[in-house]
Amino acid sequence: MIFTLGWASLAAIFTFSIAMVVWGRNGDGSIDL
């Protein structure tokens, strides 16, 4: 349970980091959420 939760949180952080890098490169907030 804890192991699975750890991997899930790691994947979420990794995905969020990639999203922030892409959003930062756009620089104009063109992504609509």
Curated annotation (Swiss-Prot):
This is Cytochrome b6-f complex subunit 8. Keywords: Electron transport, Membrane, Photosynthesis, Thylakoid, Transmembrane, Transmembrane helix, Transport. Signal peptide: none annotated. It is a single-pass membrane protein. The keyword Transmembrane helix applies. SUPFAM superfamilies: PetN subunit of the cytochrome b6f complex (SSF103451). The 4 large subunits of the cytochrome b6-f complex are cytochrome b6, subunit IV (17 kDa polypeptide, PetD), cytochrome f and the Rieske protein, while the 4 small subunits are PetG, PetL, PetM and PetN. The complex functions as a dimer. It holds the Pfam family PetN. The chain crosses the membrane at residues 2-22. It comes from Prochlorococcus marinus (strain NATL2A). The keyword Thylakoid applies.
